[in-house]
Amino acid sequence: MPAKLNSPSRYHGIYNAPHRAFLRSVGLTDEEIGKPLVAIATAWSEAGPCNFHTLALARVAKEGTKEAGLSPLAFPTMVVNDNIGMGSEGMRYSLVSRDLIADMVEAQFNAHAFDGLVGIGGCDKTTPGILMAMARLNVPSIYIYGGSAEPGYFMGKRLTIEDVHEAIGAYLAKRITENELYEIEKRAHPTLGTCSGLFTANTMGSMSEALGMALPGSASPTATSSRRVMYVKETGKALGSLIENGIKSREILTFEAFENAITTLMAMGGSTNAVLHLLAIAYEAGVKLTLDDFNRISKRTPYIASMKPGGDYVMADLDEVGGVPVVLKKLLDAGLLHGDVLTVTGKTMKQNLEQYKYPNVPHSHIVRDVKNPIKPRGGIVILKGSLAPEGAVIKVAATNVVKFEGKAKVYNSEDDAFKGVQSGEVSEGEVVIIRYEGPKGAPGMPEMLRVTAAIMGAGLNNVALVTDGRFSGATRGPMVGHVAPEAMVGGPIAIVEDGDTIVIDVESERLDLKLSEEEIKNRLKRWSPPSPRYKSGLLAKYASLVSQASMGAVTRPA
């Protein structure tokens, strides 16, 4: 048994007899009470396919931990399904749920004196929420992603949930029929699991591997794959070794590990939401990570993985050629990763990648060599300038636009912007501004997928969008999000007016409002914040505690 465990102080000895009595009530024997007690934290919900199956995976993880000589007890965390909340008040709870999940795992773990932690997640905020808790707790921990859905098909075209959102815009623009929309809806997401493209959920699953917090190859098998079950069981077994050797999460979650994750994010062209989440996980791990680190790494990292929405393939395709380790190995061989970082296997990243069993199949159609990239620069760029002094984010993997200058069309909410696009208010060449949708303003920094999909679906190919809100990982096109400071706290986006000129310049890493400094200052002096949308309840509480997007939108003590 390891030298130092939490559970003996709670469950061993005469004075802990009442605690042991309760463990006996749930079926634990004397022998099991004497073993390390571990938590299986499971983000489970029937409200959507992403986490519908994770309760079953928890049972498999328990089997693995038992084989490793541990005594597991499982508990659920909440889940907010992003796709179901999209375009409604429900989306304001999405990012909120990330920090709630972290808090829930912390509370359960510490309240019951567990010795180690297996985390199981699926939908977008569950992976970062659980990883934040692991970083905060600094205990032996290992993560396993629940897996993505298989892609759908209609009329010979491969579908993801992105196609349903864009089909709405296409229908409203009379480009497809209502029946075609219905058929796309029925076929786009045919199985349990998360969205099949490299949207936020699959991006964060990939990040769990790149950080060293998940077993190599565990992110890519689909939710319905027998290999998914195998990885879950092996994850449970691996926790035993972490506890035995006293390896805690912060020994893995180092600055170098975060550099590896950012490098992988840039190479794969993953979701912009990963910027927020990696900043948040680093904050909980006590690692100083900034937006400048993302740009520094983006400049040196080529974009090499052709994954939807920026490319052609889905997670199941990547799995067939070897999964995330294929990307990691190319980056390591090019000298772009820290190979000496510790991982949950107890081995280094380099050792894991050398020992991994790669399928003997061609993969260059999905993952290119570093010397023959899709684009020479990473898939995400941080912009700063007079419109975003603290930063903003654009996914260049999903657009070929490197410079865009246009007149502003300003909306004070996502709903107003969606109605504007629907009614034909937005014209080619314009920059749609959506503000008061930031962490404090919305609150909850909702995703603008309904608007971006409407723009794309309507065939408006020369329209940009700038917002202090977020974007779905399924978003494509010249879309800039995470503008900081946000409008609600008096960021310059608050004083943009219809007709102002906005300049997006990726090569110069700039996002500017073409006004003099004096005019910007004068407008800010005249500006006053609107009344908060919520004065009580969870969202009001969240708005009072949340930081800006440039800091990961983490909640901190007031």
Curated annotation (Swiss-Prot):
GO annotation, biological process: branched-chain amino acid biosynthetic process; isoleucine biosynthetic process; L-valine biosynthetic process
Sections of the chain in a coiled coil: none
Tree of life domain: Archaea
GO molecular function terms listed in the Swiss-Prot or TrEMBL record: 2 iron, 2 sulfur cluster binding; dihydroxy-acid dehydratase activity; magnesium ion binding
Residues binding Mg(2+), per UniProt: D82, D124, K125, E447
Keywords carried by this UniProt record: 2Fe-2S, Amino-acid biosynthesis, Branched-chain amino acid biosynthesis, Iron, Iron-sulfur, Lyase, Magnesium, Metal-binding
EC identifiers of the protein: 4.2.1.9
Record InterPro entries: DHAD_IlvD/Edd, Dihydro-acid_dehy_C, DihydroxyA_deHydtase, DiOHA_6PGluconate_deHydtase_CS, ILV_EDD_C, ILV_EDD_N, IlvD/EDD_N
Cofactor binding summary note: Binds 1 [2Fe-2S] cluster per subunit. This cluster acts as a Lewis acid cofactor.
A Pfam entry, by short name: ILV_EDD_C
Catalyzed reactions: (2R)-2,3-dihydroxy-3-methylbutanoate = 3-methyl-2-oxobutanoate + H2O; (2R,3R)-2,3-dihydroxy-3-methylpentanoate = (S)-3-methyl-2-oxopentanoate + H2O
Subunit structure: Homodimer.
Record-given protein name: Dihydroxy-acid dehydratase
Source organism per UniProt: Saccharolobus solfataricus (strain ATCC 35092 / DSM 1617 / JCM 11322 / P2) (Sulfolobus solfataricus)
Gene transcribed to yield this protein: ilvD
